[in-house]
UniProtKB/Swiss-Prot annotation:
Function: Major capsid protein that self assembles to form an icosahedral capsid. Represents around 50% of the total virion protein mass.
A GO molecular function held by the record: structural molecule activity
Gene: MCP
Pfam family, one: Capsid_NCLDV
Stated name of the protein: Major capsid protein
Cellular component terms (Gene Ontology): viral capsid
Gene3D superfamilies linked to this entry: Adenovirus Type 2 Hexon, domain 4 (2.70.9.10), Major capsid protein Vp54 (2.70.9.20)
Top-level taxon of the source organism: Viruses
Species name: Lymphocystis disease virus 1 (isolate Darai)
Transmembrane segments: none
InterPro entries tied to this protein: Capsid_N (IPR031654), MCP_C (IPR007542), MCP_C_sf (IPR038519), VP_dsDNA_II (IPR016112)
Assigned protein family: Belongs to the NCLDV major capsid protein family.
């Protein structure tokens, strides 16, 4: 029988006897915490429940717009998410590529289904963002323990993003997208819907067409052409069971009474998107792009989006995907490089960041100041805050007080080569690659709840 030797309790007193000058700075005192006597932090009484929102306008289908009204049945809105049933898709045997034709959904399918979404109070837009922001927010904020589940939620699964020919089928599937509106960031900035009787609160959505989401590719020469309804067994597909949900919190009568009578300022985050710029590595290897934002900017997202094929979404690299061995879609990680070599951020003709390599924005910045490091190539961020995930002010720059802010990029060598095209079938740049430069920002702003309405005291 194996014997187990332990330690005498007396030996622990030897550790305690080493208390000296340095320990006086580390331990003890009136404010010291006793780790073996837990203090309970009480909260006000509440309950929460999921609520399905009612559509008030439009049609929730491909290439359509629609909106939903936020219910006032609860007191606070904690978060929101959208669900959709993606239809089964089957390629015709006599499609335009015949036996060589394959179809698959683009990466980040549910991100890219949302062309644009906004939160509106009557006609005042409080927040608005596009699918590109969903890509970047997930890349830099999604911790590893949730990333696999999140990919399942938005359609990044083998059965959806790997090619099938006319003998197979893309399955019908229910997808879920958490919507990162400002009120979902923390329960402390939950939307006090019960205190806004004079505002109609709406969530609006503009959805992409299926032709911008479904990749139709030749499995031998990797040619990509736009899909049409005539290529599909069931014709033009339609979305099913599109639903928008929120989590409502219900509080006590006393707290509800105070909500309606006490003015309140809420520090929130908003998203700004700069106009997109054409990125031309062959003719302009060191482009300079103006950045025009306002308010207290805490975080910049930027990258070069590959726009060669309309249906190939969420591609921020120098190459287009190919099909290997006539069966597997590949992003060619060894060929599909970052289009950006380095970036200089300029304030009023002075370099704020001078020729910092792309790895600084893709790896170093998110390692120290982000929520996670992107797995995919081509994502960049610069964070003025000490922690991009913290709602409290921890650093920002007021772009409204700056003039002539710009980003100067140095194009990577592979971006120059691939922009010329002419590669082999499996090169990823058989066609000349086209690009556009994207810049987004997250800023602090203040929402004021007063007299039953929402407004911005600082516009």
């Amino acid at each position: 029988m194996t014997s187990v030797a332990g330690s005498s309790v007396t030996s622990a007193f030897i550790d305690l006897a080493t208390y000296d000058t340095i320990e006086k700075h580390l331990y003890g005192g009136d404010s010291a915490v006793a780790y073996f006597v837990r203090e309970t932090k009480k909260c006000t009484w509440f309950s929460k429940l999921p609520v399905l929102l009612t559509r008030c306008s439009g049609s929730p289908n491909f290439d359509q717009e629609f909106s939903v009204n936020v219910s006032r049945g609860g007191d606070y809105v904690l978060n929101s998410w959208m669900t959709v049933r993606i239809p089964a898709i089957k390629l015709k045997a006599d499609n335009r590529m015949n036996n060589n034709g394959t179809i698959r959904w683009c990466k980040n399918l549910f991100h890219n289904l949302i062309k644009q979404t906004s939160v509106q109070f009557n006609d005042l837009v409080a927040q608005k963002f596009e699918s590109y922001f969903l890509d970047y927010w997930a890349a830099f904020s999604m911790c590893g323990s949730k990333r696999a589940g999140y990919n399942n939620m938005i359609g990044n699964t083998i059965d959806m993003i790997q090619p099938v020919d006319h003998t197979g089928m893309l399955p019908e599937k229910v997808l879920v997208l958490p919507l990162p509106y400002f009120f979902s960031r923390d329960s402390g900035v939950a939307l006090p819907s019960a205190a806004l009787p004079y505002n109609e609160i709406r969530l609006t959505f503009h959805l992409r067409d299926y032709t911008e989401l479904l990749i139709f590719q030749h499995k031998q020469d990797c040619t990509i052409i736009p899909i049409t309804a005539a290529d599909l067994e069931y014709g033009k597909p339609d979305l099913k069971d599109v639903q928008v949900w929120i989590t409502n919190a219900v509080v006590t009568n006393e707290e509800r009474r105070l909500m309606g009578t006490t003015p309140r300022d809420i520090l929130v985050e908003q998203v700004q998107t700069a106009p997109k710029h054409v990125f031309q590595p062959l003719t302009i290897p060191s482009p300079n792009f103006d950045i025009r934002f306002s308010h207290a900017i805490k975080l910049l997202f930027f990258g070069v989006r590959n726009t060669t094929h309309a249906a190939v979404q969420s591609n921020y690299t120098t190459a287009s995907p190919v099909i290997l061995e006539e069966a597997y879609a590949s992003d060619l990680s060894l060929v599909a490089a970052d289009p950006i070599a380095n970036v200089t951020l300029v304030y009023e003709n002075s370099a704020r960041l001078n020729e910092m390599g792309s790895e600084y924005y893709s790896l170093v910045q998110p390692y120290y100041f982000g929520g996670s490091i992107p797995i995919e190539t081509g994502y960049h961020m610069y964070c003025y805050s000490l922690n991009m995930m913290d709602m409290d002010p921890m650093g920002s720059t007021n772009y409204g007080r700056l003039s002539n802010v710009s980003m100067k990029l140095k194009t990577s060598d592979k971006a120059v080569v691939n922009a010329g095209g002419g590669g082999g079938n499996m090169s990823g740049y058989k066609d000349a690659q086209k690009f556009e430069f994207l810049t987004m920002a997250i800023n602090h702003n203040v929402i004021r709840i007063k007299n039953g309405s929402m407004g911005f005291p600082v516009l």
